[in-house]
């Protein structure tokens, strides 16, 4: 029995090693670094171009302990754009959007609690290019209303790429996913069918070693945790199986 357990462990570690060797997270080369003593605010309608520097807060990640606005690296106000930046490992909360925002070519070296939290507004939130790795749970957390567009994002070693808040009450949300590369994750998308959420996943998406492409839940108003209802294509999870493996 011990020998059999050791064999299974060896096979699992060998498979993981082979996957890691084959798929390497394409984090861009940093052009320098800056450490903020407080969140950097991108004003409404303004653009912050990070010049591909690495930005952090000089603190240790606290894992899945819920942080707050004061713990973020960037806060993006309504209509703001954050582009060409790397979020370093020395942070608790990555980026908050307090209204419709554009996140363009932003990379997370290692996600702490969440990478990107959409906190306020009900417009369009666009995530274009960029990527994230090492998320124990969620990469993109959608708390408010509106529509999220995720295009050209790369996500490795993650819990969920996108999750519409399951404990924020009856708010309808939409998400569309295209040209995404997903490797080694639990769930690409999670939405609340009882709130009328929909997820549209384009055939340009590839996924390797991802357990579920899309799952639906019954969301709550915060008094209890949401329960998973189903996985796979449905009236709420709109896509065609099979999703291609990443080349």
From Swiss-Prot:
GO molecular function list: pectate lyase activity
Gene Ontology CC: one annotated term: extracellular region
Pfam families: Pectate_lyase
Reaction(s) catalysed by this chain's protein: Eliminative cleavage of (1->4)-alpha-D-galacturonan to give oligosaccharides with 4-deoxy-alpha-D-galact-4-enuronosyl groups at their non-reducing ends
Cofactor info, note text: Binds 1 Ca(2+) ion per subunit.
Key word Heme present: no
EC identifiers of the protein: 4.2.2.2
Highest taxon of the lineage: Eukaryota
Gene3D superfamilies found in the cross-reference section: Single-stranded right-handed beta-helix, Pectin lyase-like
Any Gene Ontology biological process: pectin catabolic process
Keyword Glycoprotein: yes
Keywords: Calcium, Carbohydrate metabolism, Cell wall biogenesis/degradation, Glycoprotein, Lyase, Polysaccharide degradation, Secreted, Signal
Glycosylation sites: 218
Cofactor annotation: Ca(2+)
Compartments reported by the entry: Secreted
Signal peptide per UniProt: 1-17
Family, as annotated: Belongs to the polysaccharide lyase 3 family.
Role noted for this protein: Pectinolytic enzyme consist of four classes of enzymes: pectin lyase, polygalacturonase, pectin methylesterase and rhamnogalacturonase. Among pectinolytic enzymes, pectin lyase is the most important in depolymerization of pectin, since it cleaves internal glycosidic bonds of highly methylated pectins. Favors pectate, the anion, over pectin, the methyl ester.
Protein name per UniProt: Probable pectate lyase G
Species the sequence originates in: Aspergillus terreus (strain NIH 2624 / FGSC A1156)
């Amino acid at each position: 029995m011990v020998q059999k357990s050791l064999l299974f462990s060896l096979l699992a570690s060998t498979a993981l090693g082979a996957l890691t060797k084959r798929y390497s997270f394409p984090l861009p080369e940093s052009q320098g670094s800056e450490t903020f003593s407080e969140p950097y605010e991108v004003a409404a309608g303004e653009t912050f171009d990070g010049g591909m520097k690495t930005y952090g807060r000089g603190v240790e990640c606290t894992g899945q302990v819920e942080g707050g606005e004061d713990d973020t690296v960037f806060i993006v106000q309504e209509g703001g754009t954050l582009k060409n930046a790397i979020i370093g490992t020395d942070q608790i909360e990555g980026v908050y959007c307090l209204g419709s925002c554009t996140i363009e070519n932003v990379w997370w070296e290692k996600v702490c609690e969440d990478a990107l939290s959409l906190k306020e507004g009900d417009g369009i939130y666009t995530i274009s290019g960029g990527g994230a790795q090492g998320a124990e749970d969620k990469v993109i957390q959608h708390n408010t209303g509106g529509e999220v567009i995720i295009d050209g994002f790369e996500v490795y070693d993650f819990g969920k790429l996108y999750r519409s808040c399951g404990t924020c009450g009856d708010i309808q949300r939409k998400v569309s996913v295209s040209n995404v590369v997903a490797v080694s994750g639990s769930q690409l998308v999670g939405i609340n069918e009882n709130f009328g959420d929909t997820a549209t996943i384009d055939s340009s998406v590839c996924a390797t070693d991802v357990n579920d492409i899309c799952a639906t839940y019954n969301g709550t108003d915060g008094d209890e945790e949401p329960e998973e209802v189903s996985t796979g294509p449905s009236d709420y999870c709109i896509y065609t199986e099979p999703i291609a493996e990443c080349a």
